[in-house]
Regions:
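Long, hydrophobic N-terminal alpha-helical segment
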Residues: 1-4, 13
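Short, surface-exposed ligand-recognition loops at beta-strand->loop->(often short) alpha-helix junctions
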Residues: 9-16
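Short, flexible N-terminal segments of the mature chain
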Residues: 18-37
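Short, intrinsically disordered low-complexity segments
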Residues: 31-73
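C-terminal structural segments of small proteins and small subunits
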Residues: 66-91
Length: 94
């Protein structure tokens, strides 16, 4: 399965806008958490999302654009297909 991480920037947004974005992204199958190889789940930074599946990068970008557009007219998005990830300082989900 392919793995993707995305980041969304809502321009001139309020905190509530990001809550709405989180809901839209979750409805589209994205998660705000990432699982480590040791089984621990970590919270991603604000407006970063994770998804795995039989997906194409271009399709992931379109879904993210649609979610962002449903919240704000002005936004920036990036979607990356990755083979692995490493991190520091993310908070474990309890």
């Amino acid at each position: 399965m392919a793995k993707f991480i995305t980041r969304v920037e809502l321009y001139n947004a309020k905190a509530e806008d990001y809550k709405v974005l989180d809901e839209a992204m979750e409805e589209s199958g994205f998660s705000r958490t990432i699982n480590a190889s040791n089984g621990i789940t970590y919270q991603l930074p604000t407006a970063e999302y994770w998804i795995e599946g039989k997906l194409l990068l271009t399709n992931v970008l379109i879904v993210v654009q649609n979610a962002a557009r449903s919240v704000k007219k002005e936004y920036g998005v990036i979607a990356s297909e990755i083979i692995g990830a490493t991190w520091e300082g993310l908070l474990a989900v309890k």
